[in-house]
Structures are given as structure tokens and as C-alpha cells.
Amino acid sequence: LDPMSPREFAEAMTMSGSKVEGWEIEGEKLDKVVVGQVLSIEKHPDADKLVVCQVDAGGEAPIQIVTGASNLTAGDKVPVALDGSTLVNGTKIKKGKLRGVESCGMMCSLGELGLTAHDFPYAIEDGIFVLQEECELGQDIRSVIGLNDIGVEFEITSNRPDCFSVIGLAREAAATFDKELKLHTPVVKAGHGDCAGLLDVKIEAPDLCPIYSARIVKNVRVKPSPRWLRERLRVMGVRPINNIVDITNYVMLEYGQPMHAFDLRSIDEGKIRVRRAKNGEKITTLDGTNHVLTDNQLVIADAGKPVAIAGVMGGEYSGIVDDTTTIVFESANFLGSSVRITARDQGMRTDASSRYEKGLDPNNCIPALNRACELVELLDAGDVMDGIIMDDHSKAQPRKIPLEADWINRFLDLSLSEEEMRAILSKLGCQFDGDLVIIPTYRPDLVHKADIAEEIARFYGYNKIPSTSIRGGAQGKYSARQKFDQTISRTMLAAGLSEIMTYSFVSPKVYDKILVPADSPLRKSVVISNPLGEDTSIMRTTALPSMLEILQRNYNNRNASAHLFEIAREYIPTAENELPVDCLLYTSPSPRDISGSR
């Protein structure tokens, strides 16, 4: 992209439909913190636990700094906060005296720079950060330790699972700024033996897992990731762990495809079975939590036991440890609703589950798997074996939608040519078969021609669409029934009552609270097929319980003189499909005095 400010980028992305919530410039709060070199260290004359250091910070003369750190030697290069500097937490550093000796700055630890030992594994947490990076005296510390990136936070809607990835957002940015999107295709050299016979994969619940793929890496060398990878993870809000774990997290962020790595030694008989759990089965996950499973939850199991809760978290027993030598990379697709229920019931929502819940593209599994193995080779983290072990039941095919240019122009009140529309859609990965738009499988939100129109409007520019008055021959007016309701409402308000509005969805238990007989027609309610919860699972046949709930709330808040009324709808199922019944309820200061009419 052409150089631009974060604000310009955010405004353009937001206008094209990818809402930016904010951005953070790394190290923005760090000011006047530079590289210094310890020239000498002497004991403090009046404090046994303090030392006095002469430090060359790139200025005309060395500066004197008093510190209690014990991990310094002459010649060490360290971050130095000069007089008048600011740390990441907002702390101001000023010249002062410590036990009578002048100190003209402060040498910084990892924490004072907003870092941890995960960011720089060679450093220690509880001492001064001794730099091993190539740097010059007086150089701004932000450029030395990589605190010079900009992190942009997007608000991603649930219908755009493809945007839970860097590639997805890059595609949006390329279309927004009219640039070509150049995507890298993973290349795996492999050549370290055939994996045939080492692992057997079988999906026993294809309705919950359409595809499961795996690759094997031997001679694994578990070690810290290189700095560039640690920095990219950090700016994305992910803590670096080791090269293998970092690779799985990096691929998830880049491709939006959750990954997992098993220690092959822990896979009993070399068998992986994707199946429903058995009632009462137990597993301890990577966070050390014990879980009891039920038969509506999907697991990854070996010949005898679960080794992971599918789409949520791996098991502790099969995790990567320092002496791991052979690993299995997993890249699979799990049914979003199944993962959501499992994560909810087990009380553990993870980065992986939050992505699976949205519904991922099965065709993304293999590219992500190959990308992970490519990174293994790039980081010299192991030897990738030939072959992909896979069980594939997926039937994901691109959807085709007619491109009706005339209808889209009328719908948007535009006059774009069909070529202009095709150019916009092509930037989003769409292809064409005559007059049909071939929708990529990573865009499950594009279903109808109106969705195509929306994409064209987004990238043509909502601000370019001319404002026009709504045209129509009908004249709006209130119906007789609406006028009657308004008269009733105004009359009640004039009498000093307050109008309330309550939900039409209630719980079946409300009939018990108002002592409705078991055989009463009022209990024959319309049931909601997809309720938010038990409290909103049916349509009310009487507004009285809702009214009483509001009245009780007022009494609980010491409003004993509540005068309330509601013009409400009651939903009585009938064979003739009649319209719902309107009713009016009002209360006096006494909760026993409730009147109404229909």
C-alpha cells in the first residue's frame, strides 16, 4: 500500500465495511530510551545493595546511574531511560539522588519496556535487560527491540469467518485501495521419508467433521522462535512459547485455520479417530483442567482415549514438550455449532473455538497444513516427511449466483457497467462462468443477488452513491386500529399512568406463578424453535405475568405508588391463523388491584 497514516487506513477500511475499532503504535509511550553501554561498576558508598555505574548513552559524556541490579558487568549494552524520559506505563524518569549519590537516569528491565522473557528468551525477568542485538550507542531502543509496528484492531462480524485471518483482511484491504493481492503459495520440500504406516486417520462422525488432515515432522528441534516471528505474534496479542507452538498460532492468525500439534509418541497404536465422546470419558487439557465429556461432544482420540477436545483444546498428555522428537500437525474442519456447544458446556472458549464457531472453509485445511510444514523447514525446526494423511468427507463446492447488472443498478440507484462490477468482484476472489458469479468457498455470507449488490456497493464506495428521496405513490397514514391504540395510550398517560413495554417471549413457568390451571387454554402457547434461553422459549398467551414482573421490580425499588399500563399483544394459537389479540392492562398502587380489557 502507499504510505498513509493509521487514521487514513482505518477510515478507508471502515467505509468499505471492515470496521476498525482502533489502532496502537507500538512503543509510542516510550520516549528518550536509548542504547547505553556500562563502562564501569563501583559499590555505592552508603548502600550495600546498590552500585554506581558509569554509562555511555551516546552523548558527549558518560552519565552516572545508581541501580540495585546484580546481573551487570562492564561492557554490557542495556536500555537506558534518560533524564526526562517516559516508560510504557507512563512513568517519568527524572534525575535524582539515591542514598546521597546522583543518578541521571535508569537502566531498564524487560517489564519496564512492556516485554517478557517470551519476547527475548535470552534475557532474565528480574534484572536489567542486557541486549544481545546488533545496535549502536544512543540508538532509540524501539528500533532495536522491534517496538516500531502498528497494530490495527478490527470488529469482525460473525458472518465473515474469512476475516478472522490476516489473509482475509489483506484481501479486503487490497479491494479497498484497488491494489493487487499477492498471496504466497506454501511450498514444502519434505523428502525425509514416507509417513505411510506411521499414522492412521479415520473420521467416525463425518456429520461433525467433514475433513481431517495431518502431516508428520520427525527430528523435531524445540527451541525459541526467531525474533521476527516472536514480534509478529506479540503485535497480534499472542505470547510466544516455542517454535512448534508458535508455528500453529502463526498459521491460525495468517490463514484463520486453527492448528494443533500432537506428540506422536502419545498417539496409542498410531491411530487417530474423530468420534463422539463416551458419556463420562475424561481428559485433562493443556491448561491443566480436568473435563468430563458427554456423548454430544466431539473428540480426537487414539486407540483408547481422547487426546483433544475437537476444535477447542488439546490434551495435556499429547502436548509438545522439550524432548518431543516427532510431531503430528493437525488441520481439520469441525461443525461450528458442535464446537460452540462443546466450548459452552465445558466452559472454555478459546481462539480456536471462536473461529470454528463461525463456520470455516474446509478447503482451507490443506493450504494451512502445508504452510505450517513450510515454516518448520524455514525455521529449521524439524524434518518434514512426505505425504498427507487425510480422511475427507467434505462436499464444499463454490456457490453460483446470477450477475444481474440491470437489477443491481436499479437496486443501488447506480449506472455501473457489468465490466466494472466484474472487476470489483474479481478483487474479492470471485470468478465467472458466463453470467454466473462463482463464489469462493471462504465466503459463506454471499448467497443471494442482494449480497452481490452489497459487495459492489461496499467497494464502489457508499459515499459515492447519490442521495435520493424515497419514491412511491402511497401516502402514509395511521390505520383505524392504530388511532384507537393512540387514543387509549394518551388517555392513560393523561390520567397519570406510565406506559411500559414488555417482551412477548416468556417462560412456561410464568403460568405456574399466576396459578393458571393445568388444563387452561392459556397454557397452549406457540413454542419458539430457536429460543435464546428457557426464559424466552414461548410466546405469551397473557400479558399479566410480564406486567406483574415490572410491578414487582418497582416495589423492590421502593416505588410503591407505581401506576402502570401496557397495550400488549397476546399470542393465542388458532386453527384459523387469526391475528394476535390486543389487550390493555393497568395497575393501581395496590398490587392486588389489576384491571384489563381486550
Regions found by a protein language model. Give the residues of each.
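Glycine/proline-enriched, intrinsically flexible loops and inter-domain linkers
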Residues: 11, 51, 177, 181-281
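Conserved phosphate/anionic-ligand binding catalytic regions in large, soluble enzymes, centered on
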Residues: 76-77, 161-175, 239-259, 304-322
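Terminal amphipathic helices with adjacent charged low-complexity linkers/tails
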Residues: 177, 181-199, 382-407
